[in-house]
Regions:
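Membrane-interfacial terminal anchoring regions of lipid-handling membrane enzymes
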Residues: 1-878
Length: 878
């Protein structure tokens, strides 16, 4: 007999509930969902993925992004379109990179790469759920996606698909983005969305597709066959994954214009922001839709704005409309580029060959370039490089093409539009402008409209802030024309954001050395021609060292105007000019700051700044060491060779100068080597010196201010007056940091001088310093960087001493000054032939005219300037 249970204690019967069992299984990812990938791939999957994904490249951006995210962040990768290929690639590749790999694909169904046993369990679990609930499980309503993401799994989400809108809008299914917004609202952990796009090439999308694009899909959105063929090609460099800045949902929902919206409207705004991000991301790599040149010209000429311009021109000029239209069309035909990927590839081949055979390679600031890539995802870039060589036209296009960025449209002088270079430059994105728009209102307005059109289309624009090439080796004063037009276009809202990028393009040696020396000596500039191109082939047999490209931080115009609390659309003429001037000089200073100090510049500076005909090599080494030490202390960027082995790099350059005849070696005994400077070669050495002179100008000003003190003991306050005078005196030659005062620069240089034992602080008196015995010689070596310019300005001042007011026409002044300089040099009144520089004369003339000199009648002012110049020269050389 069975014992009966005691009364009051009910019997617990075990019963099987199919509904409960299936619900329990649905909460376990391994049993239920096709949206979840295994933690690791199986051996067969690894073989397949390695074969198909081997040509897909990923840069360091993902790791850098992940390093910035909080440790407790919930992370989802987002793509513009639904793509199982991208989901599988991200899961497979990111695991191997040590990055969070997406395992949860919201609205994805991945069955084929699931383990067999798991696939069976998924089938039975989903079947049981269907039998018990009469519908398939919804991972949104069951909380499956939410729970997995909260547990630390990384998600994968897409913005759009062919059926996505129908699913959300017509069938009222849960929106994945609405789901993660709800998730952010219930957790303190930040949710981050990382936008990523898989690119199958960098060719710009054309508004007229080719037959191949129609059949197999475009490079932007390739069909399955095109994707497959692209992936399996050997050594294919075209396929890569690109990432944009992550979106923090917590910050997004806290934005004032988002905070008060309903979840539905917040989702809509999030989708719009992501769509804009993906659009700018693609545009930052492939560029905007590429139109035919004739189509672009027609669209400009038929625009309402140009129609109004033409009507005004008819009214003001009295010409008939057809004649004015023809003139406008001719202007645009003269200006417009003919951008072609074919010519970009030719540029690539040509510069690759030159860098390998003529130069010793190119050194690129990769960190700076990465910042530029991110800025390009917010709007068009305004690239503002310095200009030292015709090669500059190719360098940035070459770099951008190699780094998967759209090549810029480049502003070039009309003098370069000659055949055959004109069509070649146009094909690479060059558009041409005249040197002056004076007295041609129609041309000016057509040109500005063309620039506005390029920016509104989304093209990057490159122009040289100095206008023409610098023949002196240092930066020239900025020209405001194109920058002013860019600011006007920005004020008209042609783009939501523009970023100005100061860029330094430097060379150990430039190809145009000889022509620059000819022009600096007063020779006429020869117009560009095919004959010059043929003669230039002789240069191809010479090695020209390295090319250096460095980027400063982009200047966001949105941030710039926000900081100044100005509306760019409401600037008056004076404010516009002030803003333009400020930005121009900021660009010039930024370019100087990111330029590279080369061994050529340091050796040339040491040779020219020593005041002796024969220089012991040991003494030359001391001077070079002093200059190099200063550069290190001021954190100046160095050429690669100076970073690896500076002594060897400087010695190699000195030997190269001997081989080229710039200097002679007075003895073959290495222990007693003496250098004799070839006086006729001083101008070319001055060009190299000027490549680095901007780094030494604060030291030169500070040194000369110290030398001007009667005693070898002084306070920092004693130096400010002289420092300020020198800054004003050479305002057209050298450009001071707009964000640093003279007092700050003096303090910084005093610290560097103390570290180099040039100065010692007074033991008891505060802010008081003494010059050491060895320091006095070094102060003269630093201040010697100013000697050439002091002598040039002395020549200009002698012009004012000799000629009364209005006796020499303004256009003839420079010729008179150059002739006077030659005579003074022959009489021994000028000791440095490099001071006979037309550019220096021009800047000196501008300074004296600005200070009020008009002619020999201004005796008191002339005498004051003369005494000061001679005083400075004597302090340095005696």
């Amino acid at each position: 007999m069975h014992e009966m249970p005691e009364p009051g204690f009910p019997v617990k019967r075990r019963s099987f509930s199919l509904r409960k069992w299936s619900r329990d299984q649905m909460t376990h990812e391994k049993e239920s969902s096709t949206s979840v990938l295994n933690r690791k791939a199986g051996w067969l999957s690894i073989l397949i993925f390695r074969f198909f994904f081997r040509n897909i490249h990923t840069g360091p951006e993902l790791k850098e992004t992940m390093d910035r995210l909080p440790e407790d962040a919930i992370v989802l990768y987002a793509t513009p379109r639904r793509s199982t290929l991208e989901f599988l690639f991200s899961w497979f590749r990111y695991q191997r990179m040590g990055m969070p790999a997406p395992r949860i694909g919201l609205d994805y169904k991945v069955i084929i790469f699931q383990p067999i046993l798991r696939s069976i369990r998924i089938f039975f679990t989903r079947a049981l759920y269907l039998l018990t609930h009469f519908r398939l499980a919804d991972p949104y309503t069951t909380g499956f996606y939410r729970n997995r993401l909260m547990e630390g799994h990384t998600g994968f989400i897409y913005l759009s698909s062919k059926r996505g809108f129908e699913r959300r809008f017509l069938k009222s299914r849960t929106d994945a983005f609405s789901h993660i917004i709800d998730l952010q609202k219930i957790t303190e952990r930040p949710v981050y969305i990382i936008p990523q796009t898989l690119f199958f090439g960098i060719t710009p999308h054309r508004d007229t597709p080719s037959i191949i694009d129609l059949i197999f899909g475009s490079a932007e959105d390739p069909g399955k066959i095109r994707r497959l063929l692209t992936l399996v090609r050997r050594n294919n460099q075209k396929v890569f994954m690109d990432f944009s800045e992550p979106i923090c949902l917590k910050d997004f929902l806290a934005e004032p214009e988002i905070k008060g919206l309903s979840t539905e409207n917040q989702t809509l705004q999030l989708r719009r922001r992501l769509q804009k991000t993906f659009t700018l991301q693609r545009q930052s790599i492939t560029g905007p839709v590429l139109k035919q040149r004739t189509e672009l010209i027609e669209s400009i000429l038929t625009s309402e704005k140009v129609q109004r311009i033409l009507e005004e021109e008819v009214r003001d000029s009295g010409k008939n409309l057809p004649a004015v239209r023809k003139k406008a069309n001719d202007y645009l035909d003269e200006i417009a580029a003919n951008y072609s990927m074919g010519w970009i590839k030719v540029y690539d081949i040509a510069l690759t060959w030159m860098l390998k055979n003529i130069f010793e390679g190119i050194s690129v600031d990769q960190k700076g370039l990465a910042k530029i890539r991110q800025a390009a995802k917010k709007g068009p870039l305004i690239l503002v490089p310095c200009h030292k060589s015709h090669l500059d036209y190719l360098v940035l296009s070459y770099l951008f093409h190699h780094n998967k960025m759209p090549c810029p449209h480049i502003a070039a002088g009309k003098n370069l539009s000659f055949w055959p270079l004109g069509p070649i430059f146009r094909g690479g994105g060059a558009f041409f402008l005249r040197r002056t728009f004076k007295d041609n209102r129609l041309y000016a307005r057509i040109f500005s409209t063309y620039v506005e059109t390029l920016l509104s289309e989304g093209f990057n624009i490159e122009f040289f802030i100095e206008g023409g090439r610098s023949r002196t080796g240092k930066l020239l004063s900025p020209k405001m024309g194109l920058l002013s037009q860019t600011l006007s276009a920005y004020g008209k809202g042609v783009a939501p954001e523009l970023s100005i990028v100061p860029i330094s393009i430097g060379y150990d040696r430039v190809l145009e050395e000889k022509s620059y020396l000819h022009e600096l000596g007063g020779g006429e500039k020869k117009p560009e021609s095919m004959g010059q191109l043929v003669k230039a082939r002789k240069s191809l047999k010479v090695r020209y060292g390295k090319v250096y490209v460095n980027f400063d931080n982009p200047i966001s115009l949105n941030d710039y105007f926000a900081e100044k609390n100005l509306n760019p659309a409401e600037l008056d003429k004076i404010t516009h000019q002030e803003i333009c001037t400020d930005l121009a000089y900021r660009c010039i200073h930024s370019i100087n700051q990111v330029s590279v100090a080369t061994p050529y510049g340091i050796v040339a500076g040491a040779l020219l700044n020593l005041f002796q005909p024969t220089i012991p090599y040991a003494r030359l080494e001391e001077v070079m060491e002093a200059y190099l030490s200063y550069l290190y202390r001021m954190d100046i960027r160095m050429a690669d060779t100076l970073q690896v082995n500076p002594d060897y790099a400087l010695r190699q350059v000195a030997e190269a100068f001997v081989q080229r005849g710039f200097v002679d070696a007075a003895t073959e005994n290495r222990d007693d080597l003496r250098i004799v400077l070839n006086e006729s070669k001083r101008p070319i050495l001055d060009y190299y010196k000027n490549n680095v002179i901007a780094f030494f100008i604060p030291a030169a000003y500070t040194s000369l201010a110290i030398l001007e003190q009667d005693a070898l003991q002084f306070t920092s306050g004693d130096l400010h007056l002289t420092y300020g005078r020198l800054t004003e005196f050479f305002n057209d030659e050298f450009f001071q940091d707009p964000d640093r005062s003279a007092e700050l620069l003096v303090r910084k240089n005093l610290k560097a001088f103390i570290d180099d034992a040039i100065l010692v602080p007074h033991p008891t008196l505060p802010d008081t310093y003494n010059v050491t015995a060895s320091g006095l010689r070094k102060l003269k070596l630093f201040s010697a960087f100013l000697l050439t310019y002091l002598e040039s300005y002395w020549v200009v001042l002698n012009f004012f001493m000799r000629y009364p007011k209005d006796t020499v026409a303004p256009k003839n002044r420079l010729k008179k000054i150059q002739a006077m300089g030659q005579r003074m040099s022959k009489r021994g009144e000028i000791n440095r032939i490099e001071a006979l520089s037309g550019v220096n004369y021009k800047n000196g003339l501008a300074f004296f005219l600005r200070s009020g000199l008009e002619g020999s009648e201004d005796k008191e002012a002339i005498e004051a300037h003369a005494n000061r110049i001679q005083h400075y020269i004597n302090l340095i050389v005696t």
